[in-house]
Design a protein with these regions (language model features):
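Carbohydrate-active catalytic/glycan-binding domains of CAZyme proteins
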Residues: 22-289, 324, 369-373, 378-384, ...
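Short polar catalytic/cofactor-binding loops
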Residues: 30-38, 46, 296-300, 307, ...
Length: 424
């Protein structure tokens, strides 16, 4: 017993502070099938699995909020621009410092004669730092939309140039999204006749654009719209788009600069709910994405299943076993918390001594229940154990493969309470 007591005291040696590596953060703004008057905001750490930050997060004082596009400006503030109505000559603007609480700025009238429809504004920041919006316009007496660009005339994004058409992209194109690689502008745009998303390039933002992919060139099928692109950490590009006729939302990846694309997949948990969205990727927040490997069952990893925490082999889907190890919610100095990667905003916490996955409710009780001190492994100091922050004599351990917190008073308990953080 004395040996065990000495060993237990030894493991109280704290490990270095949690990893300071940055996890990329993907912020999504969208309207939904249930409402075109409210914006929802989601967050992801892998660009695939998104958790709700707030919904509704913003409701304009009047009109609609369709097609919200998000930008982080040089002032550190987040801005969205959006479609204000089915008919009209305005686009809307709102701002936020935290992506959750939004303030209406203004509706801007575009000075185009006989403008009847002003749809799908998308931010585009050029390599010279200029801020632009790509927008689809239709005037009275015409049957088709034409992509245009407007340019910010001041740093506060309150004054804008007159719309300039994108040569080579119209009429008959809508929902245009542009990225720039090197000196080339790459435009993804919906053909309103064939209902395909097509692809064109130019050496100038305003064109002329030359089509490189038309019809079903990428294999996504037709009756799709609202393309939005992000670059993933592995260098490949992801396009997300709205399969509006099927009521589904899709994504597809390209590893060869848009030459070919993977088969489209439905966006997990959000397909069938979100509509025409945009995603902003930022180099992110402190914390590493890791899996927790059991010391005495090395083929098993911690995972969540129906919001319960357990260890299992051959975890499927593997994302259930990936956690972002972040500075502790209750104490960021020498303590950690475990945030789910595929359910962002949900953390491992103890409840009646059993570990569960639960959404952070912002209370002090939650923060303490979800915080653990990472110490040298109770069975092997080269591994790691996790002592409860608010029940300091107890550690995360598995018992009958279920994760819980318990005092450690046996060699079996020491092995059950020891884990290794491994790359996903």
């Amino acid at each position: 017993m004395l040996a065990l007591t000495s060993m237990a005291l030894a493991v109280l040696t704290l490990l270095p502070a949690p990893a300071s590596a940055a996890t990329p953060v993907y912020t999504m703004t969208a309207f939904t099938n249930s409402s075109e008057s409210n914006m929802y905001v989601y967050q992801s750490y892998d660009g695939t699995h998104y958790g709700l930050m707030k919904g509704p997060a913003y409701t304009p004082p009047s009109g609609l909020i369709r097609d919200p596009s998000i930008l982080r400006h040089t002032d550190g503030v987040y801005y969205v621009t959006y479609t204000t109505n089915w008919d009209g000559n305005t686009i809307g603007f709102a701002r936020s410092t935290d992506r959750v609480n939004w303030t209406f700025m203004q509706n801007v009238t575009l000075p185009t004669a006989n403008l009847q429809n002003t749809w799908a504004p998308e931010w585009f920041k050029d390599s010279d730092g200029s801020i632009n919006i790509i927008v689809s316009l239709r005037t009275t007496g015409t049957s088709n939309f034409t992509p245009h660009v407007i340019k910010a005339l001041n740093a506060s994004l309150t004054a804008w140039s007159s719309p300039v058409p994108l040569s080579g992209l119209g009429p008959n194109y809508i929902d245009t999204f542009i990225v720039k690689l090197g000196s080339t502008y790459h435009a993804f745009t919906k053909n309103e006749t064939s209902k395909y998303i097509e692809y064109a390039t130019a050496s100038s933002l305003t064109g002329p654009y030359t089509f490189k992919g038309t019809g079903d060139w990428a294999g996504w099928g037709n009756w799709v719209e609202g393309p939005a692109l992000i670059q993933l950490d592995n260098g490949s590009w992801r396009i997300l788009f709205d399969g509006y006729s099927s009521g589904k939302y899709y994504y597809s990846d390209s590893a060869n600069t848009f030459a070919s694309w993977s088969a489209k997949k439905e966006l997990p948990s959000l397909t069938g709910f979100v509509r025409h969205l945009t995603v902003l990727k930022e180099p992110g927040q402190a914390g590493d994405i890791r899996r927790l490997q059991s010391f005495n069952f090395p083929d098993r990893y911690a995972r969540h299943y129906d919001y319960q925490a357990r260890i299992e082999p051959n975890v499927s889907p593997v994302e259930d076993s990936r956690f972002r190890i972040v500075p502790g919610l209750a104490d960021g100095n020498g303590a950690v918390s475990f945030e789910s990667v595929n359910l962002p905003g949900y953390f491992l916490r103890h409840s009646n001594y059993v570990l569960v996955l639960a959404r952070d409710d912002g209370t002090n009780q939650f923060k303490q229940d979800a915080t653990f001190r990472d110490v040298a492994g109770t069975a092997n100091p080269a591994w790691t154990s996790y002592q409860s922050y608010n029940v300091p004599g107890s550690y995360i351990r598995h018992y009958n493969y279920t994760l819980r917190i318990d005092p450690i008073n046996s060699s079996t308990g020491q092995s059950d309470a020891t884990f290794k953080e491994v790359s996903p």
